[in-house]
């Protein structure tokens, strides 16, 4: 079946499927897979099955690019740190995940730059916002776990940014006066659309590409 256009989105939702129909795109490339755990049946009446059924009825294929995109050398975290002015940006892990970069800014200045970049005021911080930051580490999405937090400290980052954090990580950061910034899972991965757009344009210069932004699931 010939591809009539590609819609890029963080999540393949009802809204994304409808937008793909309206814009004449019969392929959706999302970052998050609809199905994370194996299923024996798609006949169950639940949200995930309904979304898949909606795509099927509309003739829309869905492809999820998740871990392979997170591990790119020019991944979402790398792009985010470069966009806020970090220098010497490299990946945080040897396998390509996350990013680290050098800065010379106050914590509060970085916060304002991130808010402007992500167009989202719902950013939460831990630590003294007057603190001078020399090195940032970042992992988009759910990077606020023990392994990622430990890696950020290991490379000498004095600010770690992610989409969401485990409570005990937030508590440890507060108790040790370590700077954290939680920007929201969705907001931290919005640049997925730009990453995929650039990849597709390199290989298919005439393909129609539509970027779809569902928005943060949280109110306010």
Model-derived features with residue positions:
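Active-site catalytic microenvironments in core metabolic enzymes, especially phosphate/sugar-handling
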Residues: 1-220
